[in-house]
Regions:
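Membrane-interface micro-motifs in multi-pass membrane enzymes
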Residues: 124, 130-133, 219-229, 233, ...
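Membrane-interface segments at or immediately adjacent to transmembrane helices
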Residues: 198-275
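PLP-dependent class I/II
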Residues: 11-14, 279
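Helix-boundary/low-complexity linker signature
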Residues: 34-45, 78, 270, 282-286, ...
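Methionine residue identity
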Residues: 1-6, 14, 18
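Solvent-exposed soluble domains appended to multi-pass membrane proteins
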Residues: 259-267, 277-278, 283-614
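Transmembrane and membrane-interface helices of multi-pass
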Residues: 13-221
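Hydrophobic N-terminal alpha-helices or hydrophobic patches in metabolic proteins across all domains
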Residues: 59-76, 82-87, 91-103, 108, ...
Length: 614
């Protein structure tokens, strides 16, 4: 019995020791695992820290394509840009699960955005904005005529980006998170990103944090806010909000006050109306001294002195260096870009159904309506928009025959011959003709040399791009003189309207500015001319803006005007000029008048056409 007791005690002792040994080993194993987990998270933390640096480099280098962000982007805005880049960077990482790939995508986006903005600024003098994405096709169609040679800054910044791109291979060793962690992180980062972008678009947030909010000066806005923050702020304006206090019935009541009755007598013997919106036609003397070996627009300058049956002056546009379609929009509709997002393109964004315009109105009076452009039909969506504006006959480059070229474009001389051919063909219809022609000859850029163009006009500046531009303007001036000479000999009553769509880009204009501080609105002035082969009241130095010009032309021509045009004529007495580039106030100007105009424009552009279609 005693032996059995001793054996039991020994067994219990041995089992106890075994349990203690197992417990010690388990504790040691748990400690080791805990240490490994701690070390793992430390390693992940280090990798995450280095990945967090990637968006910072991406932001500053992207800005360096255009300027020095450390000196010119406001401090608070720099932090907001970095935060925006961080959110995008982390979203890419959690979506892909790979630091190396995500960082390369982020750098690639920064390079693409930076280079695109640089060239848009170079060629158009305004920054890249969200709605430029709608214009990608048009931009591609004319890209071959611009000089894309990279400057020193671009080369250096791109080389640094390439070096960083190569270094991202170090991230291949970075650990990965489970899909559960990634999914939760995607949702969290997405919510923060949406909330932050929304905050950037709020006026109170912009004011509190000293963000520059004025779309009127987009280049400065981008410079002090940074590209990413400005782009996020601009997203709020992709769609046009209803004006405060807007009511469709109230807009209709307001227009009804300007309605006039049109009788059959009013529509008898209506004149042909020919409108030529000439590509980049301008007189750069408005920017500074400009001396040349011969007058670059002798005919226009002569007409500006006060010719019989002629109205001349300067018309203020809303665009500079590009976005031709916005000038078309203002002239044809009577609407102003001042009430639409900066850089937006109504042809591509807003005109999706029948829209009131000069063409549609003249068609209702019995006119045959023609839209002509000696280039690709798809440019600015014209082939789809023109019919919605009331044009029944469309001519694009494939419809032109036996033409001459200047550089790579159909010449203005051939284009104006096409106008004459259209007029002659239209006579058989017995209807007056409304011909709206948008030329192409003078389109930028102006840096390349061509076998079919010699720069005959030479200025005091050592700038061949400027000399080429002035030579092109001289050719246009000759073509215009020939056109008016032809119609001065025809019996049919005809009125010709001629104006430029905008001034050329900074490559040319900055030469004449010659470093001087030029009033902003002068950069948006182009000459215009209204001439007839019958009696109209002549005038010179009569300045206006494109939204008014069509109504003023109809009045000069003796053609009845509709309610909206009558309203514009009334408004022009207190606000002689309204464009996205600014306003000119007259006697009796009142901010309430602008608010009324904004409401009526919204009705014309977004509501009136819907009512007719219902």
């Amino acid at each position: 019995m005693e032996m059995e007791g001793m054996e039991g005690a020994i067994l219990i002792f041995m089992l106890g020791n075994m349990e203690q040994t197992v417990a010690r080993k388990q504790t040691k194993r748990e400690k080791n695992n805990a240490q490994k987990r701690t070390e793992g998270w430390k390693q992940k933390g280090i990798w995450l820290f280095w990945y967090a640096v990637v968006p910072v480099f991406a932001f500053y280098l992207m800005e360096c394509y255009e300027h020095n962000p450390f000196a010119e982007v406001r401090v608070g805005a720099q932090l907001f840009n970095i935060f925006l880049f961080e959110l995008i960077g982390w979203m890419l990482y959690f979506l892909t699960g790979r630091m190396c790939f995500a960082s390369r995508v982020l750098y690639g986006l920064a390079v693409a955005f930076g280079i695109t903005n640089h060239y848009v600024m170079k060629f158009r003098s305004t920054p890249f904005v969200p709605w430029d994405l709608f214009s990608a096709g048009t931009a591609a169609s004319v890209a071959g005529n611009y000089d894309f040679t990279p400057d020193r800054r671009m080369v250096i910044v791109t080389l640094v980006f390439i070096a960083l791109f190569v270094l991202t291979c170090l991230f291949k060793k970075a650990p990965r998170f489970s899909w559960k962690i990634r999914l939760g992180s995607i949702v969290l980062v997405g919510l923060v990103l949406c909330t932050f972008v929304n905050a950037l678009q709020q006026e109170s947030f912009q004011t509190k944090h000293y963000l520059y909010p004025f779309l009127f000066t987009p280049a400065y806005m981008t410079k002090v806010n940074g590209m990413a923050v400005t782009f996020a702020m601009d997203l709020a304006y992709v769609a046009v909000e209803r004006p405060a206090g807007y009511d469709a019935d109230e807009a209709k009541e307001t227009l009804a006050k300007y309605e006039t009755k049109t009788t059959e007598t009013d529509t008898q013997d209506l004149p042909n109306i020919i409108v030529i919106m000439d590509e980049a036609f301008s007189d750069l003397k408005v920017l500074g001294p400009l001396e040349t070996n011969e007058d670059y627009m002798p005919f226009m300058h002569r007409m500006q002195q006060g010719e019989k049956n002629t109205v001349t002056g300067y018309v203020q546009t809303s665009v500079c260096g590009g976005n031709t379609a916005d000038s078309e929009f203002e002239f044809l509709t009577g609407n102003t870009m001042a009430f639409l997002p900066n850089g937006s393109i109504p042809y591509q964004q807003y005109i999706k159904s029948r829209t009131p315009s000069l063409a549609g109105y003249l068609k209702s009076l019995g006119y045959a309506t023609y839209a002509q452009h000696p280039y690709q039909a798809s440019g600015w969506n014209r082939d789809k928009v023109y019919p919605l504006l009331g044009f029944d006959n469309l001519d694009f480059m494939e419809d032109y025959r036996d033409v001459s070229y200047v550089r790579n474009y159909i010449s203005d001389a051939s284009d104006m011959e096409h106008i004459i051919e259209t007029y002659e063909k239209n006579k058989a219809s017995g209807k007056p003709a409304f011909i709206f022609n948008v030329t192409m000859q003078n389109h930028g850029g102006y840096t390349d040399t061509y076998m079919n163009l010699t720069n005959d006009i030479q200025s005091q500046y050592a700038s061949e791009p400027l000399n080429q531009y002035l030579t092109l303007i001289h050719k246009t001036d000759q073509a215009l003189e020939n056109l008016i000479d032809y119609f001065s000999k025809v019996d049919d009553r005809t009125i010709i309207v001629f104006f430029g769509d905008h001034q050329p880009n900074d490559t040319v204009a900055s030469v004449v500015e010659n470093g001087a501080q030029v009033e902003t609105q002068k950069r948006y002035l182009v000459p215009y001319l209204v001439w007839s082969n019958y009696g109209i009241e002549g005038a010179k130095d009569k300045n206006t803006s494109l939204n008014y010009l069509a109504a003023q032309v109809l009045t000069a021509a003796g053609v009845p005007t509709n309610a909206y045009q009558n309203y514009l004529l009334s408004l022009s007495k207190t606000y002689p000029v309204i464009s996205a580039a600014g306003q000119t106030k007259g006697i009796g100007a009142d901010e309430k008048q602008l608010q009324t105009y904004k409401k009526l424009q919204y009705y014309q552009l977004f509501e009136k056409n819907k009512e007719k279609d219902e």
